[in-house]
């Protein structure tokens, strides 16, 4: 169209199917698809036709087109005085001759610039005008048809406002068009560039065989929604009727470089006027056509840039549609992909700054001229998600309104390039004056005025029917667009008209809110932006040259997509005036309005598939664009929701950004995308289409799908959150894709932030209801009773470091609802969503991760190259070491440079291996590490007090710290103070030995709970300053004057009493407020009446006097005995139920129900200082109340004070009031044991109670489990010694009580035993080696002594044996002290060899069956029982079953420990109690398993006893084998053996000899005489041997050899003369022995290897009563039950206290048959057993004997003779 208003579109008739969606839509919707363009249309006729078209359009889409037409008509009238004002959208019609004459001057230049296609001479302007008029009519018809299909509502906006805006814009556009025309006239040829190949745009404009304009009949009405593409969906319903770009927008200089005034379609005629007049924009005219009804068609209207073509075609809508048949491919492409907003840039629409954008009235998108800026809409205009906001028209308004010039491609030009983006990128010249020739703009590629509409059309095509959206009430985007995250979001109102002078010019990129690139006049005055738009010399210069493929699909990124990306996302919503030309420079950061308009339709941002094609250039502007209003976060994908509040979107369809993610067909923007959407374009300048790749590697985030993982809720966060995240805050990939805010890999995810994203809408939890938080198990209710959820004042914030670690424990909202971190304190912000929001709202550039220097690794040439784990690249290694050590190693990366390499390559090699202590790497808190636990004895009292004092000091310092008030909430401060009180109470409890009674206790209570009591009287006396009365509640005394006493009331009372109605008299006194009478009378009645009277008194006389008397009221209730209900005086039941407390007396505002809670200290002080019966129950009730409100520390103080009624138990006990001090087990049951401090405080409480215990220490069974957890943590942090001490303390506690506890279950015992084993086998804290380093000074002393005690034992002689019997034994000492000496069970080994042939493995592996078999074999092999009675096979099998049971028990725990550790039961759980108390010491180490081996072997050869000790892990005692040989060879007896045997034989002879007369008295005397001599010799030898043995185990061994030689000789001598076989005894007896040395039997050095072991196993297990006397007789009996027990029960547990009753473990007693089994029936006479075995048995019965016995045995064993003598006695006796 010329500036005169004449439109020249000769090529329009020839153009291929119109690329204009509006036209195409007309085709689709037009009833007649074959409408033909009238060959000639006179201006008059055009006006008439326009009027007709207006009428038709009014019928179809009156609202939309009326608005547009009215706007354009106004513009045309203003721009073309000669032209008849078209009342309807007819402005496209042929202009009058006057207009022609006026515009011709400008048109030539413009036509040459913009449309080379139009080649008619300027002289024939009139002819062109006629043709153009016809085309315009056709366009008008098409537009009308489009408007018919469009939503009529779009034109609802009043035409007056649009007309005003259009008039202003027209005036401006005319000026610009005149200038452009002049410029074009001067250098038309220069500006024109011939393109060898016709572009899609040209084909769309020019008729071609492939896409004939007229031949191809389009459906009468295009169903843009049929495709299902966002393009179709886009804004058809939502978009208000597109207001035809008025002359305001005419001459759009799209970036002045991009499209400028270029006539799309290739019309080159200079006479073509592109919007200089009111009709500048075809769409303006078309859109205004519905306004025809408002204004008569004016054929003379100056056509807008688009209108130029439409004017000629106006005669027939259908024909025009056919003539302008949109390229079928082109339109579908637009549908497929978001239309690139090739909106006429400033150049196109702005060419004619016909009227400055001043039409605020046109705020309504529909009614107002599209170009008329609408103030309300500027900030709020919601971009239609379905249509890209056109610069020339509001995309929401109807796609049909698109100017003819807009290609169907919409924002994308025929080359698939995003014109809108280009336009934005190019700084727009001032809209009013810029009128560059289209030729200039086509240097990058020829672009005609049609090209510009092409950009615009794309969006409109989809949005054909667009509802009119008033700025105030943006239309809700149609839900159908998947791209729109929130269909419900109100459309953004058009930007205010005042935005720029060129109101009609398409909004510059600066007006991101408007769809500037759509080609439609933005609702906002586009001209202001044009100046900002840097003129680009070539329209296509910025776009990468590509084949002009139409966008394959709305989603297919176009080369211009990158450019479009800014358009996709509008800059932060600004009023148009806010947007300045300067913003155009930020076009990369600003999204064109198309974003809002076409979120649904717009083609996804052209993100390069590879970094080589980054869609977004690196941000050039570091500063984020100010976000006066959040820009619609048009995501790079059409569906991206507008980042700005949807309601601000210029186009109604714009979805709210928050929801956009969810609804958008594209993956949701990154979490920060709320702001990211705009952020990407605003803060992150999108790269130009030609952006060169900046990265060689394309991050996965560049993929649109990379953001699917982003939760939609983040986008759904409030608009605040969107605004909070300015685009510049969001990091972007090379492609410009917004990334989630960078987080360090080690950075912990802030729960508060995540909660905020989901719950930013949620009101801050700080609002507290008076209802206490519900217990964790209870469901929350609206009422918020203590069990119901509600925000309540005592919200517990774990932020308080001193508070229990559990976070949110007291927060009613967070603690109950939010899954806040259960362990560890959560940041306060986590509790309160508002804090999070505030943090996010702040404009702060987040840390941008620096480019990491990750170089490629040199790939090895061997098989390592195919390693799927790529270990050759090196990886850090971390491992936990022994004894709390950490082993780490990090690979070394050595850079290697090569020729031609820009960056070095790295070769990894193993790094240094570091061994560090956990204490250094992960140190345990000092206060926890220095805790003096375990607290076993009273000696720890001082240490405990010291620890509590330090803890209190740290708390007090924290309270005094001025920062504490700022970092902690009021509730947290209260809890911190209460925690201090709790520690003080515990400190006093320890100091006072656990007693809370007495004067000291009363004084302490006064100091703790009423420190101000002493000063209270002084303070009450007078108030020197106003500050003194602060905090004092107002007294209501004035309102409750004392009532006078009524004499008649007294008389009535007397009468009632006279009648005997005492109760009635009481209530009468109450009614008359005769409280004294009432209480006196009620005291004589039942307790219930007394309570009720007191309640009434408190309610009427105490509480009403003042609001601070709750504590006194509670005390009175306590006196009355209302222990349960007294707490109602602090917090009424109604308040606990969640009801608001209102002042009934009207004296003040509503009461704070929790105000009474703060009176708990006063209440406790009153109760404790005025003790009454049952007041502890009141303390318990108060504690429960405080616990309900999360005041854990205060509640536990009450429980401690009322400990007599408080129930302390485990968390599984529903009735438990206290589990661990300092933590609420009801609301946070799973947190118990996680934080050590509550465990330590509870240990202190237990210790304090134990101080007051008269008998045993006070033990809390449930606490032992937590102690074990404490031990584990200590072990984990490298405190092995302390952990081991805890294990021992727990074991002792279990054995200390005879009462069984469910907490001592199998799982607990197994865990304890497992930890104990680990600790015993791990190195000590001082050394990391397996064996602790011995100090040099002890090498000669300590080491040798240990060897002596460990290997040999120092018991050569009977005296030494006796001594050893009382000692604990080497095993207990060595095993406990030196974990490195694992073979502590070597004792057993020393004697096990005798039976080792049967015992293949340690008892752990030998099951009872094996033992039985072995014993039986041994018995058979022996063919005789050594020591006769003692070893009988029968007992063995009998014992085996019980042993199996016991063994099974023991095995499960720690079978091995017995081996090395005598002190600890190795097999039986060391902690399992063993019933026999006597032998616990002895059995503890070996007894656990002795039953198995002992039971089987104890009666067999001496070997079984050895086996009872399990196979010797340290050193099997070979002498056992020798002993076996000795058994076979009785001759090998030493004198000592003979002596021992003699002693035993003499004892037996004394018992039996009296009855036996086998020999004569003379013989006896001779034998005795001879025997005495022999004994004397033997005694001397024995003494010498003992002396030698005393030297050490080595000496014992050496001594053994010398003894061996004389031994046999002496034994033979003695045997020959004195020994005889006694059939009664069944053994050989020494006649001479008599009772000569009976005492030596008791002092027998070592118990016999075989029998002693058996005896030991048997006797060790059996209780002392069952134990046999030193003589062997007793041995037979003991085996019954004793051995079984010893074997089954771990020795330490052997004590009855820890007896087998431990849960889960069958007691040894279970095997009832065991005693009979153990009983040795074969022994016959109890006295019969040989004396030596008897003594051995007796010695073995105790732990000391076991320990000592092995030592003695060791010595004896070292001497084989000793071992042999025991064995030899029998064979020799038998032989003899």
From Swiss-Prot:
Feature: compositional bias, Polar residues: 111-124, 144-158, 394-406, 415-439, 612-627, 692-704, 716-734, 1445-1454, 1477-1496
Keywords: Autophagy, Endoplasmic reticulum, ER-Golgi transport, Membrane, Protein transport, Transport
Biased composition (Pro residues): 522-533, 629-644, 1662-1671
Presence of the UniProt keyword Membrane in the record: yes
Gene Ontology BP, a term: intracellular transport
Gene3D superfamilies associated with the record: 1.25.40.1030
Key word Signal present: no
Short name of any one Pfam family annotated for the protein: TPR_Sec16
Composition bias type Acidic residues, residue spans: 46-79, 162-181, 217-226, 321-353
Ranges of compositional bias, category Basic and acidic residues: 187-196, 1560-1586
GO cellular component labels: endoplasmic reticulum exit site; endoplasmic reticulum membrane; ER to Golgi transport vesicle membrane
Low complexity: compositionally biased ranges: 557-573, 761-782, 1652-1661
Region Disordered, annotated ranges: 1-129, 143-277, 292-817, 1428-1776
Localization per Swiss-Prot or TrEMBL: Endoplasmic reticulum membrane
Membrane topology: Peripheral membrane protein
Chief location: endoplasmic reticulum
Family: Belongs to the SEC16 family.
Role description: Involved in the initiation of assembly of the COPII coat required for the formation of transport vesicles from the endoplasmic reticulum (ER) and the selection of cargo molecules. Also involved in autophagy.
Record's protein name: COPII coat assembly protein SEC16
Gene that produces this protein: SEC16
